[in-house]
Amino acid sequence: MAIKVLVVDDSSFFRRRVSEIINSDPRLEVIDVAVNGKEAVEKAKSLKPDVITMDIEMPVMDGISAVREIMKACPTPTLMFSSLTHDGAKATLDALDAGALDFLPKKFEDIARNRDEAVSLLQKRIAEIARKKSFMRRPVLSSQSTSTVESRTATTRTATSALTASPVKAAPAAPIAQRFKATGKKYQLTAIGTSTGGPVALQKILTAIPANYPHPIILVQHMPATFTAAFAARLNNLCKIQVKEAEDGDVLKPGCAYLAPGGLQMMVDGRPGASRLKILDGGERMNYKPCVDVTFGSAAKVYGDKVLSMILTGMGADGREGCRMLKAGGATIWSQDEQSCVVYGMPQAVDKAGLSSESLPLDRIAERMLVEVGLK
């Protein structure tokens, strides 16, 4: 049975273009289109599509407001289309706040080297997020995120809302929650890699990390160049630790998280306790910029067994080879479990390779980190 898709955009050209791409895949079928957010909400309720593709800027009701309404009334996996501008980045992050699962640039040439590759990517994204329909739930205000915002200085920090919805249902609670025990290993660096679903996952984890976290955190999120600065600023507004977009020459400091800039590669250089970040173009050899494999591989060379690493939700297998290098050096590797992933691709690749020592639900990863580093 084909995956039913509702296409929402005020541009007739874009509706037609997206519909043609979707309908060219036998797994997918466009069941209707909507020209604004209000119409999208109505059709989502009546047609119950498996996936919605949603523009952000539309008359009558914008895409962000529409996503909020849809998540309240009939939670549906939603893929946003966004412009690659600073304002577009902020709006896209707001849409993820509201419950959208993923996003793609409206200019397909910005996401692939040729048309066929772009078409395939869009089709794959729709097919992947459709699998999460049965796990969708309504957004719930996160008291943790609220208190975190209040704990930071005012001004613009309070203007940025928390990612209030986890788009997938957490694993069913056991009668008695598992109690974690530290392994006793000593760490000097935490490394996290993620892709699809990563913005929500990273915020969930990082907002629970205290300011006295004992070592630096490096973050690799597959994201366009214009998005990473806005995402780092948003995280910094919400977290007790400092979060910044990484710059060439940054000295790694405890209690600070460094987000790899989009369109570039981030590498760790130096020696433990005196390491810096190198930001490079990296050429076209790698499929991803930033690439988890590149960053994790460099961390393995510098920090060896002193790395606590995690692979979170994401499509593909980026991170597997970097984790292989980390594992060879004695580092610790965890993965996000299948049920809490938006896309169980990157964690699955690590799990199947036998590289992960623990598979954890998203809502307990921060707790596990704090236990492991002796803060809980």
Swiss-Prot record:
PROSITE patterns: CHEB (PS50122), RESPONSE_REGULATORY (PS50110)
EC number: 3.1.1.61, 3.5.1.44
Coiled coil ranges: none
InterPro entries reported in the protein's UniProt record: CheB-like, CheB_C, CheY-like_superfamily, Sig_transdc_resp-reg_Me-estase, Sig_transdc_resp-reg_receiver
Residue ranges occupied by any Response regulatory domain in the UniProt entry: 4-121
4-aspartylphosphate PTM positions: D55
Matches recorded under Pfam families: CheB_methylest, Response_reg
PTM comment text: Phosphorylated by CheA. Phosphorylation of the N-terminal regulatory domain activates the methylesterase activity.
Gene Ontology molecular-function annotations: phosphorelay response regulator activity; protein-glutamate methylesterase activity; protein-glutamine glutaminase activity
Major localization listed first in the record, in broad terms: cytoplasm
Annotated region (Disordered), positions in chain: 142-161
Stretches with biased composition (Low complexity): 145-161
Location of the CheB-type methylesterase domain: 183-376
Reactions this protein catalyses: [protein]-L-glutamate 5-O-methyl ester + H2O = L-glutamyl-[protein] + methanol + H(+); L-glutaminyl-[protein] + H2O = L-glutamyl-[protein] + NH4(+)
Cell compartment(s), UniProt: Cytoplasm
Similarity comment text for this entry: Belongs to the CheB family.
Biological function: Involved in chemotaxis. Part of a chemotaxis signal transduction system that modulates chemotaxis in response to various stimuli. Catalyzes the demethylation of specific methylglutamate residues introduced into the chemoreceptors (methyl-accepting chemotaxis proteins or MCP) by CheR. Also mediates the irreversible deamidation of specific glutamine residues to glutamic acid.
Domain remark in the UniProt entry: Contains a C-terminal catalytic domain, and an N-terminal region which modulates catalytic activity.
HAMAP family: CheB_chemtxs
The protein's name: Protein-glutamate methylesterase/protein-glutamine glutaminase
Organism, as annotated: Aliivibrio fischeri (strain ATCC 700601 / ES114) (Vibrio fischeri)
Taxonomic lineage of the native organism: Bacteria, Pseudomonadati, Pseudomonadota, Gammaproteobacteria, Vibrionales
Gene: cheB
